Amino acid sequence: MVFLFAKSFVGMLFVEERSLRRSLSSSELTACVGLVFVEGVALVGGLERVDDWRGTKRSYFLYLEVVFFLEDWELLEMSKAGALDLASGLGGKIEKDDVLSAVDKYEKYHVCYGGDEEERKANYTDMVNKYYDLVTSFYEYGWGESFHFAPRWKGESLRESIKRHEHFLALQLGLKPKQKVLDVGCGIGGPLREIARFSSTSVTGLNNNEYQISRGKALNSIVGVDQTCNFVKADFMKMPFPDNTFDAVYAIEATCHAPDAVGCYKEIFRVLKPGQCFAAYEWCMTDSFDPNNQEHQKIKGEIEIGDGLPDIRLTRQCLEALKMAGFEVIREKDLAVGSPVPWYLPLDKSHFSLSSFRLTAMGRFITKNMVMALEYVGLAPKGSQRVQLFLEQAAEGLVAGGKKEIFTPLYFFLARKPQSDVL
């Protein structure tokens, strides 16, 4: 049965993935989506009998194509949309034969595998690099080019909210055309490209992961910002820039990977021009977090292992770190508070959306089985299923943390470097 599933899933999905998308019109998709959806759901629940599989697999794959087409139609911009794309990127720059060993080493940094916070902080470069080599392909497959959350309005799509969240940061910084801007921990550059085009600025992306930089450069070239935007491979605790280099600096859910917030913010302070601003969205535990509550600690641990974090700071600790680094805090707010649509909704298994299908319970179930099939036939490296598993664990922790209001990925602050930067 496993072989039949692997052979059918991998073979048919790869062959039909783009051909169906090209051959079906939007009206045809609208006409068939209801029927195909029902048949797809029936298949998911009926894999016990081979006859059922053979009789419905065409409808199931058509269903997948309807969903993936609609994702494009809804402008989710999945830059690596296919199963082959996912398979080819798994492991990043790690040799395929070494992926399983890298997963073992990464997991051992975390509490549930015997690791501790001090070890994670001491080895944060290795831990975070392994993490992003292992997960970037999954992120891009399921989330798109911008690896972050956003507060949402009712009726607003996930992709629209992500763009607005990036524009908000640019507007808070007051970016002007031709300014030199630094994106600290830029991922594959989704926000970098969006903010550069929105504000007509030149953005440098700082990242310590070689695989993500290679993806970012390729995507910059595709959209035509490779002449105005660039990437630098470096540790944000030791930036290779002269003092007072940038007109503005921002970080989107990235400096949470720093082992020391004060040290990271001091480096940002150093490379920022006097009188200019630093804005960020930070991952934080809120004041509702109780370190003596075992359930709270379990949720925190799930987020840490699933998201490559040495620790998760409290909002007030980030605020204090900014001041210790020399910044004047202009404003700060947890944007999760009062958001009409919860930031964690795309990860909530009770939520279903065609436009963000791959993040739903059914979409994640399909991805799980697809990864199993890819690994079984040798197209994905051994260890890929375990990466998918700790990402599932992260999703559960994030949703639980959001619902209990003990965690936020949306702690926003805007801080200024004084005209006189003598501390």
Predicted segments — roles?
Residues P291-L410, R416-V422:
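Substrate-binding/catalytic lobe of Class I Rossmann-like enzymes that use SAM or dcSAM, i.e.
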Residues L76-Y141:
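N-terminal auxiliary segments of SAM/dcSAM-dependent transferases
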Residues D247-D260:
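A short SAM/SAH-binding and catalytic strip from SAM-dependent methyltransferases
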Residues V262-C277:
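A short glycine-rich, Lys/Arg-flanked "PGG" loop and its adjoining helix->strand segment in the class I
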Residues K180-L182, L192-K238:
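Class I SAM-dependent methyltransferase SAM/SAH-binding core
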Residues G185-G189:
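Class I SAM-dependent methyltransferase "Motif I" SAM/SAH-binding loop
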Residues M237-A248:
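A short acidic, Gly/Pro-enriched loop at the edge of an enzyme's catalytic core
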Residues E145-S146, P151-Q179:
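Conserved alpha-helix/loop element of class I SAM-dependent methyltransferases that forms part
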